Amino acid sequence: MANLLPIDFSQISTYITLAVILILSVVLCMLAYRLMNVVPAKWLCDYDEEPDESLFGTRYIFKQSGIYTSALFAIFNLGIFAFFGYSYYTIFFLLISITMLLIAMSDFKYTIIPDQFTIALAVLCVALAITDLFTQQIFIKEWWSIPLGAVCGGGSLVLINLFSIVILKKSGMGFGDVKLMLALGACLGFPMVFSGLLIAVFIA
């Protein structure tokens, strides 16, 4: 991977690098908790609902779960750095990971994925996909892989939801999950989106 900045990072101590990533992960996690407490309550409601009292005031307390969340977030970011090193991929995935953390926190507590978070994720994913297409081509080899990956990602969840409704007689995932996979599918492209789906199913 080419360095993002014209600086010889090869001489930087590995321990210093790891410390920076760990500290940055904790800071970003604290920022995510802060953002979840200040975003408008309306963001955490369905379109036809009004915020109730539970959405006002403090929604997340860092001391209660922030340490565990920070640890998992740091491990993920260390993995990203180990794979991509000092490159724009690391920066993109760091921004994507913090957005995904906000989505996970919202979905976990309020079972809703705000459109604002999804739009931010989509912008980052498409930007990464286009950048990848014109540079390293790790995920995206052809331009049509971006829209096809998005369609396959979102479409797969639509089919799973239809199967759940018709066969199991109960609703599966919400449309927020479909929009989420549309964004991630654009980032991964076709056919890597299916690998992403398998990983998502395994984690879930």
What does each of the following model-derived ranges do?
Residues M1-A204:
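A membrane-topology feature that recognizes alpha-helical transmembrane segments
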